[in-house]
Every structure is written in structure tokens, then in C-alpha cells.
Amino acid sequence: LKIGQIWTKQAKIKGRAMKTYPVNEAHRLETGQLNMPPRLLLGPGPSNAHPRVLQAISNQQIGHLDPAFIGVMNDIQEMLRYTWQTSNPFTLPVSGTGSAAMEATLANLVEPGDVVLVGVIGYFGERLVDMAGRYGADVRRVERPWGEVLSLDDISQALDEHKPAILALVHAETSTGALQPMDGVAELCRAHNCLLLIDTVTSLATAPIFLDEWGVDAAYSCSQKGLSCPPGASPFSFNERALAKLDRRQGKVPNWYLDMTTLANYWDGKTRSYHHTAPINSMYALREGLRLVVEEGLNERWARHQANAELLWDGLAALGLSCHVKEPANRIPALTTVRVPDGVDAKAVAGRLLNEYNIEVAGGFGQLAGKVWRVGLMGFNSRKENVTLLLAALKEIL
């Protein structure tokens, strides 16, 4: 007899036959316990979660309005302010990946017809262009070749020409490894009465960021890179200028799930009214990841990422390999793009690293497909022993 038939024959409760239904058993897959292979994740994200984060995420679930969970929310908000160096009250994690946080900034700030100027220096600038356009923005571009950064003069001229409501920049362009300088940008934005929005997905907790000092109005990030957490709870911050634009909207935010005018009632520290069920265990993980940042200290953490990046760059040079971003000051400490030598199959090398050494690195995509490897040293994974292991494996393969 099949499992379903046996159950039907035996199902009786207190002497009365249990009602059964014809169930299609075709997709009743019997599987073993999940056991994933050990990987050293040295790609552009996710990074390996810190052991303490994995322990935190296994805590008992409680309700998203439980007073104990409200305490978790408060801790996350305050530690995010430290990590971003901001006093913005409206700082919180979005339920979703970094792409959800990216969309949240645009959904709340962009109204149809708004001129949005996007700095395009790689794939994620292109994504900002796409997203802003979907919300009805009149999107303009200021761009440089993939691997370069925008100069202050580039930005100034574009602001003069386009007079945008919002300037959106990718601080750390994960597709190219380029770190966009921010000095002087906010002053230009203020002079043109536009908001400054930045993507810090790969730079949060890995490179110096000062939202308040830089005059950033809106920012977003993710949990699975520099914070060494699983994906699912993504930092988001608006200052008073951004909130004022949100308050002036002529219509509703065209995305219910990410509407900060209603989410605010859950995160404002007062009302705590239901909007949606928060990813409880992902929030546990984020809290622990932020605790690790606080314990280490920002200067120490930034210095660790920079030192290990330089160790990697020197080791790559010794192997005859070069970085795609030529100027070291413009390289992301947590993400290095390595030029693939002529005659070398980038995908084959990455495959051998994974299959023979359990090391994951990523290839390029978009304009850099097949031309670079992307190597991440993020958060918990930014350690000297990981650099040494990767360089030794590359030496053997190449």
C-alpha cells in the first residue's frame, strides 16, 4: 500500500473515522536532512556568517510585537546609527535583501516627473536607473567607464545641466570594485537643492562612511556582506530632508510593502503598530552582526579590511595579476576585481577554486563578463588566513 492509503486505513480518532481527501502524491518528495558543503565565500556576497550570528539566528522565535522583540528592534536601530555614523531617527532594517532597501529609497522619494540624476559607474548604477524609471522618474545619467569613478567636476557639471530633485550614487560599485569619493558632493547637492542618495551595500562596515558628515539624505545597505549575516534584513536611513520630501508627496507611495509612511508606525519607537510580520530570526542575526561591529570599533574594522585588501593586492601582483581599478585609493577594501589574464578561462578557474578548494569567487558580469574575477574580503571573511589560502590556490591553478 502507498503511504496515503495506509494513513487512510489507520486514521481514526476516538473510534470515529477521520475525514480524508484525495491527495495528489506526485510531488511528495522524500528528502534527507539538509547538509550543505562547507564553502569559503570570497565572492561579492554573501559572505560567511560569523559563528555568533549563526548562533543568534537559531534563537527561539517570538512575536513581532512582543516586548522582548521591541528591544531587539531598538538595539538594531541604535547600532545601525553607530555603524553609519548618523543620528537619523528614521534608521531601520527593511524586511528583504539589499535590492529591497534600494527599491524602498526610490519608491518613497521618487514621484512621477522628478528628475533623478544617477551616477553610473557599473551595473548597480544601471539598476538605479531602471528602478527610478519604473517609478516615473525623468532619469538622467552622469557616467564613467566601468572601473573608474566620477570626479567632483563631473558631478558639478551634471547638476548644473540637469537640475535634479535627487542625485543617486553608488558608493561601492560591486560590479567593478570602484569606491566613489564623496567629499564635496553634498555641498553641490545643497547648492542645487537636491537630495543625495547613496548605495552602501558593499561599503557598510568595511570602509569609512559618515552619513551625517557627508550630508547624505538617504542611504541603504544589506546584511550579507560587511555585516556577515544571512540576507534578509537590510539597513535603510532617511534624514529630515528626505522625510520632508516624503511628506510632500502628492499621492501614496506606489509600493505598499515598502511604504515608509506606514512602516514608520512599526519602527517609530512609540506606536509599534502592525504593518507586516518582520523576519524575526533575520533580525536576531542582524543584531548580533552589529554587536560585532560595535565590539571591534569602526576604526579598527575599517583598518582590518584595508590591511587585508592591501595584502591581497600585493599577493596578486606577485602572481602577475592586476586589479581592474587602477588607483588604489578608489578600490573597495572589501571587494577586489582582478583582471583575467589573456588566454585564461575565467569560469574554469572559478570552477576549480570551488570544486577543488571549496573557495567561491565570482566572475564579472555586464561589460566585465569573462574579464575579471570579483574577490570579496567582507566582514568575518576579511582575515589574513583567507588571503593566504586564496593566493596559494590561485598559484597552483594558474
Predicted regions and their residues:
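PLP-dependent enzyme catalytic core of the Aspartate aminotransferase-like
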Residues: 19, 32, 367, 371-398
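Active-site C-terminal subdomain of aminotransferase-like
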Residues: 48-49, 224-314, 318
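Conserved active-site segment immediately N-terminal to the catalytic lysine
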Residues: 212-224
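Conserved beta-loop-alpha segment that forms the PLP phosphate-binding cup at the N-terminus of a helix
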Residues: 89-117, 125-128
